[in-house]
């Protein structure tokens, strides 16, 4: 699944990126490309761990609906 990603620039340089739907799924890097590469690794590990523990994955449709509600507010 392709969950929405939020990217923040860091004041000291570099970036932090997160997937809000996947609690704790975030990464940082010096460049945008490095940050996104790291985030994809973390996402894969997050999903693998969730499957190992038989956790239900967040619905992509629900996450998109949340974003639409937030942007309309």
Swiss-Prot record:
GO terms for biological process: regulation of DNA-templated transcription. Gene3D superfamilies: 3.30.160.250. It comes from the Bacteria. Coiled coil: none annotated. InterPro entries: TA_system_antitoxin, TTHA0281-like, TTHA1013/TTHA0281-like. Belongs to the UPF0150 family. This is UPF0150 protein ssl0259. It comes from Synechocystis sp. (strain ATCC 27184 / PCC 6803 / Kazusa).
């Amino acid at each position: 699944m392709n969950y929405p990603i939020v990217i923040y620039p860091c004041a000291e340089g570099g970036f932090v990126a997160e997937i809000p739907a996947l609690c704790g799924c975030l990464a940082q890097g010096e460049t945008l490309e490095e940050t996104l590469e790291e985030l994809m690794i973390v996402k894969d590990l997050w999903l693998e761990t969730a499957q190992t523990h038989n956790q239900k994955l967040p619905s992509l449709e629900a996450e998109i609906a949340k974003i639409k509600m937030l942007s309309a507010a």
